Amino acid sequence: MYIDGVFSGGGVKGIALAGAYEVLEEKGFRFKRVAGTSAGAIIAAFIASGYTSKEIHALIEEVDGEKLLDQRYSFLPLKMLQWVSIYWRLGLYKGDTIEKWIADLLRAKGIRVFGDLQKGSLRLIASDLTNGTMIVLPDDLARYGLNPDMFPVARAVRMSCSIPYFFEPIKLKTDTGTATVVDGGVLSNFPIWLFSKERKRPVIGVTLAPRERERPKKNIRNAFELFGALFETMKDAHDARHIASRYEQNIIFLPVDDVMATDFHLTQQKKLALIELGKRRTELFLKQWTY
């Protein structure tokens, strides 16, 4: 059965998305169109490029997450280097290594630019801080004077997963100036709304967040907790409105509480546990899902 799929962001927690994909594929579901933000952008790009769930599972087992972080070398002490990197480079890590890793894997399937994919089969979300707008890739690239068909898919994925202060933002250079682009999760971490205006088949979403009614209330007692709650609300409120009103029955919820989004040092055991969580939750979802 053909479906469309939407995958949420969540950093390293996104390994659980691979488990969900594995069960969906085993049950005979095939994706015509996929969309995603951040970690969801990575798995969406792999699916659109023809990777099977088993192949993605193998990639997760093989990759050393620590090696995807391009370290900076300096005479400065580590702590000082980190502050300098954030202040001047706007990110602890350049992000070049993870982009190359993605590009190499896509190239192995014959995919380099969006024109190599079936038109409309992949959409990714990024955030343009310079102009204060959300970017839907590749659709909105024309706004920047860029040819969507000739834009590298790996660069678009890198834009979508540029976690603020962790990876350097992407500087999108155009004829009209330079836009600073960061993680799509800043504006829409779970773009389940993307296919609503042109729904052609069932849409299944997979999110790394809990159901709205299961979310813990935020305790705000100081400025740091206020900032955290403010950022979380900005990130999730837009998507939560869509989920609550229309889509919840079509969403697989994979709440991951014991892993940080930026923990690239996961053991094999923890990776497999995340995949198993995705599989288990998806099997439960399919037992009661009707379409």
Swiss-Prot record:
Q: Report domain PNPLA positions.
A: 5-196
Single GO molecular-function term?
hydrolase activity
Q: Which Pfam families match?
A: Patatin (PF01734)
Question: How is this protein situated with respect to the membrane?
Answer: Single-pass membrane protein
Q: Which GO terms describe its cellular component?
A: plasma membrane
Asked whether the UniProt record includes Lipid biosynthesis among its keywords, one would answer no
Is Transmembrane there in the keyword field? yes
Could you tell me where this protein is found in the cell?
Answer: Cell membrane
Q: Where is this motif: GXGXXG?
A: 9-14
Tell me the function of this protein: Probable lipid hydrolase.
PANTHER family the record matches: ANNEXIN (PTHR46394), PNPLA DOMAIN-CONTAINING PROTEIN (PTHR46394:SF1)
Tell me what this protein is called.
Uncharacterized protein YqhO
Q: Which organism is it from?
A: Bacillus subtilis (strain 168)
- Gene field: yqhO
